[in-house]
């Protein structure tokens, strides 16, 4: 990919943002080297790795990179067999700790989805617990070795501590006895030796070795003779300590050298993971998605946003190219937002082809291009003192030398900077030449000739950026299929140009041109209306789909409950019959035994008695089954009242009646949290046990206290608010509340209207009104329940 397009479309700014999420210097360098990949396979693989990292971020949070430093220099030194510094070893130890933690972090549990690429990288990580443990045991910080690094070091430092304690006692005694000769009653250290500050004129009074003097020469730092031997002993111990530390560092460095190949592989994988998660973190904050990548030259971006414009200011657009048409001409006035659309498309393509998530909705598509060319801005004319036209044409010549059917070409104000007639003719010729090669092209222009060219040329489409004449600002919404209107007359009028001047200007323009501009304006208005209608239709379609799915789930739950009830009944009936059959078999066996014994009068009596038992058992089983059927069927309701409790045998559950029977003989009932319509004739009298009656009385006393007199629906969308209010009204009705308040806020009125529409159809609502002064005004609705 050519460097000019990366610079012109400000891809470097995107890389700077991504770099801020990387931790190691090496990963930051990888980000700065990032550019579109050379094959569609590489593009898809790098997009997939970013998407996998985003999935893990969403599910597990940030990976455990804490304490990670770039260890490239330490590894290079270790590879040569050099002794590493305390800092270098500590950083390698931390890197090995991160290796272990990352391996655990990326391990997939059975219930988790597979992440092919990142799990493959995890398999390359080799945990070196022994090396990590040896370093962490020996090194405390970047400039300190632990006492426990070796027994010898521990012994040396203990001796040093004792010697230092002894010499401090000795030097304090000397300071006290020679106080009159000293500048300060303190001791200090020079060159690792304890000394005292003696006034220069009294140096003969304190025998010893002079180690230093003050800048004025008034003070000499003398090591008293009495301290020389102790200082020598401390110095010897310090030399031993330094030698032992060097031995420990050499030993640890040798351990690192022994495992250097594994350490190097681990570090390279960690750097790559750092790079991948930096891309994912940026994509997450951007609200980015993984695009679908094709090789057919098709671009289809839904709700595309320029990634460098702040979220609170950016306007999204649907941008598509490559199916019905291969060239898109964005027309309209200057400062109309055309260039932003051009840059948005080009920059999103560069991001996607570089493995970054794009600022667009799910299922957006980008195409793999071998080259993207852009002629935007006057960069070259400023650098080389060329005219605007010469600058653009120089760049266009270079583009036309290289562009082919795998190229995407972006032109800003093609043909501008020269005579309009010649400029338009050149622009059309350039477009035709590139179209013949199979290029995909997006170009902005304000030439009317190019609008006509797009209208009459196959595979070329007009587009415009919506412009608000009232505010004299573009809305940045792209309208594909509608050429742009210059709005020069209207803008001039808004800025204060006299009407008579504008009317004179209109006379200069041909009637056909004016009619063409009016036609464009009419097309724009119709396009905007159609787009708004389509957006509203999509919202309604989504709402309908949600309701459909919700009631489908309810129906499936009811069916499941009913099937379970039937299954329970069948099991119980089978148990009764099986029990009766077992007893009957036992009686029949007794009868056969009696018959084999011979038929005596006594035997006949016993036989008849057993036959009687059999008849009784069968009759008893039949009676129990019949009773079970009657219990399940229940007593029919003679009168149905709203609010009464009834039994619904099909689900073997008590329900609350919510409405009177309609013309189909159906009533609405509530079963738990579900509302369903059933035939009134299917309802039965609900019989209560004594315990249920006691519980119901207690609930009746508590219900009124449990249901609040108002509910706050602010902050919810219309669907959620209506669902919540519906459930609240049911609870309030059952609790016996006569009046409740729904708080929806004032806002735009959308939520209030949705609530109002719901209340008109609600079976429990007698009437409703907006709140009065002191009740919340138009921000609340007061509901009277039946």
UniProtKB/Swiss-Prot annotation:
SUPFAM superfamilies listed in its UniProt record: DNA repair protein MutS, domain III (SSF48334), P-loop containing nucleoside triphosphate hydrolases (SSF52540), SMR domain-like (SSF160443)
EC code(s) of this entry: 3.1.-.-, 3.6.4.-
Keywords carried by this UniProt record: ATP-binding, DNA-binding, Endonuclease, Hydrolase, Nuclease, Nucleotide-binding, RNA-binding, rRNA-binding
UniProt-annotated binding residues for ATP: 332-339
An annotated Gene Ontology molecular function: ribosomal large subunit binding
Domain Smr: residue ranges: 711-786
HAMAP family on file: MutS2 (MF_00092)
Protein name: Endonuclease MutS2
Organism: Clostridium perfringens (strain ATCC 13124 / DSM 756 / JCM 1290 / NCIMB 6125 / NCTC 8237 / Type A)
């Amino acid at each position: 990919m050519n460097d000019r397009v990366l610079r012109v479309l400000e891809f470097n700014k995107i890389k700077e943002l991504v770099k801020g999420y990387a931790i190691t210097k090496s990963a930051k360098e990888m980000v700065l080297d990032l550019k579109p990949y050379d094959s569609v396979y590489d593009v898809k693989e790098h997009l997939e790795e970013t998407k996998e990292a985003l999935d893990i971020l969403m599910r597990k949070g940030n990976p455990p990179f804490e304490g990670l430093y770039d260890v490239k220099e330490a590894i290079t030194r270790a590879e040569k067999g050099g002794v590493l510094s305390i800092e270098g070893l500590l950083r390698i130890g931390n890197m090995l700790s991160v290796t272990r933690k990352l391996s655990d972090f990326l391990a997939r549990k059975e219930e988790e989805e597979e992440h092919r690429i990142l799990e493959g990288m995890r398999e390359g990580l080799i945990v070196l617990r022994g090396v990590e443990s040896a370093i962490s045991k020996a090194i405390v910080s970047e400039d300190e070795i632990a006492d426990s690094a070796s027994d010898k070091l521990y012994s040396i430092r203990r001796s040093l501590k004792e010697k230092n304690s002894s010499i401090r006692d000795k030097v304090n005694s000397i300071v006290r006895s020679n106080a009159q000769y000293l500048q300060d009653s303190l001791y200090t250290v020079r060159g690792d030796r304890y000394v005292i500050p003696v006034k220069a004129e009294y140096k003969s009074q304190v025998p010893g070795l002079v180690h230093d003097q003050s800048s004025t020469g008034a003070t000499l730092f003398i090591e008293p003779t009495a301290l020389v031997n102790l200082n020598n002993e401390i110095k010897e111990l310090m030399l031993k300590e330094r030698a032992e530390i060097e031995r420990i560092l050499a030993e640890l460095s040798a351990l690192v050298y022994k495992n250097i190949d594994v350490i190097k592989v681990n570090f390279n994988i960690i750097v790559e993971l750092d790079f991948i998660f930096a891309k994912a973190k940026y994509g997450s904050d951007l609200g980015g998605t993984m695009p679908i990548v094709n090789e057919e030259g098709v671009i289809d971006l839904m709700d595309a946003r320029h990634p460098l414009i702040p979220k609170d200011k950016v306007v999204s657009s649907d941008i598509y190219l490559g199916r019905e048409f291969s060239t898109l001409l964005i027309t309209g006035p200057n400062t109309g937002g055309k260039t932003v659309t051009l840059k948005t498309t080009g920059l999103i393509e560069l991001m996607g082809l570089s493995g970054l998530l794009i600022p667009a909705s799910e299922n957006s598509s980008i195409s793999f291009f071998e080259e993207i060319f852009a002629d935007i801005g006057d960069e070259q004319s400023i650098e080389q003192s060329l005219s605007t036209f010469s600058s653009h044409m120089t760049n266009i010549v270079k583009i036309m030398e290289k562009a082919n059917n795998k190229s995407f070409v972006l032109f800003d104000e093609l043909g501008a900077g020269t005579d309009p007639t010649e400029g338009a003719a050149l622009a059309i010729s350039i477009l035709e030449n590139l179209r013949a090669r199979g290029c995909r092209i997006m170009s902005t222009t304000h030439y009317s000739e190019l609008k006509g060219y797009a209208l009459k040329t196959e595979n070329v489409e007009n587009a415009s950026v919506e412009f608000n004449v009232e505010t004299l600002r573009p809305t940045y919404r792209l309208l594909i299929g509608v050429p742009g209107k210059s709005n020069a007359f209207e803008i001039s009028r808004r800025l204060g140009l006299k009407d008579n001047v504008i009317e004179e200007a209109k006379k200069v323009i041909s009637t056909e041109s004016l009619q063409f501009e009016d036609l464009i304006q009419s097309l724009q208005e119709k396009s905007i209306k159609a787009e708004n209608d389509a957006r509203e239709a999509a919202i309604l379609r989504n709402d309908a789909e949600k309701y459909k799915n919700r009631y489908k789930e309810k129906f499936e739950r009811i069916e499941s409950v009913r099937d379970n009830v039937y299954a329970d009944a069948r099991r119980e009936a089978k148990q009764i019959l099986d029990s009766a059959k077992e007893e009957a078999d036992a009686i029949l066996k007794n009868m056969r035994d009696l018959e084999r014994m011979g038929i005596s009068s006594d035997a006949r009596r016993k036989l008849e008695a057993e036959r009687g038992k059999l008849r009784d058992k069968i009759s008893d089983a039949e009676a129990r089954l019949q009773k079970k059927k009657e219990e399940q069927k229940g007593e029919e309701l003679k009168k149905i009242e709203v609010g009464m409790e009834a039994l619904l045998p099909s689900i073997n559950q008590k329900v609350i009646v919510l409405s009177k029977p309609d013309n189909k003989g159906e009533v609405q009932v509530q079963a738990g949290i579900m509302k369903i319509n059933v035939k009134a004739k299917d309802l039965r009298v609900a019989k209560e046990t004594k315990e249920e009656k006691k519980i119901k009385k207690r609930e009746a006393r508590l219900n009124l206290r449990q249901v609040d007199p108002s509910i706050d629906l602010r902050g919810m969308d219309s669907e959620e608010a209506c669902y919540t209010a519906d459930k609240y009204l049911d609870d309030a009705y059952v609790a016996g509340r006569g009046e409740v308040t729904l708080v929806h806020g004032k806002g735009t009125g959308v939520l209030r209207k949705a609530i109002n529409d719901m209340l008109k159809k609600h079976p429990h609502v007698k009437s409703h009104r907006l709140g009065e002064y002191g009740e919340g005004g138009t921000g609340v609705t007061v509901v009277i329940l039946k």
